[in-house]
Amino acid sequence: MKKERTESLVAQALKNIGNDRYMLDNLVFARVKQLNAGAKTLVNMDPKRHKLVDIAIREIAEGKIDIDRIDERN
C-alpha cells in the first residue's frame, strides 16, 4: 500500500462526499464505531497497527464507504 499524507486522503474523502466536512465527520464517526465493534476493514490496513480513524478515512477516500453503505451496515 502506498503511503499517502493524511491531508491528501482527507481531501479525496471530502471530494467523494461532496466537500461536506460535517458529513465527513459523521461518516468517519459512524465507520469507526463499526470498526470498533468488529467490522472488517475494506482496505488493506491492520487495525492493530493503524488508528481506526485513519482506516475509516482511507475507506471513504477510496470510495468503499459512503453514506448509503454506512446506513446499510448499521
Curated annotation (Swiss-Prot):
Offer one Pfam family short name for this entry: RNA_pol_Rpb6
Q: What does this protein do?
A: Promotes RNA polymerase assembly. Latches the N- and C-terminal regions of the beta' subunit thereby facilitating its interaction with the beta and alpha subunits.
Q: What is this protein called?
A: DNA-directed RNA polymerase subunit omega
Q: Which UniProt keywords apply?
A: DNA-directed RNA polymerase, Nucleotidyltransferase, Transcription, Transferase
Q: Which family does it belong to?
A: Belongs to the RNA polymerase subunit omega family.
Q: Biological process GO terms, please?
A: DNA-templated transcription
- SUPFAM superfamilies for this protein: RPB6/omega subunit-like
Query: Known HAMAP family for this protein?
Result: RNApol_bact_RpoZ (MF_00366)
The record's catalysed reaction(s) read: RNA(n) + a ribonucleoside 5'-triphosphate = RNA(n+1) + diphosphate
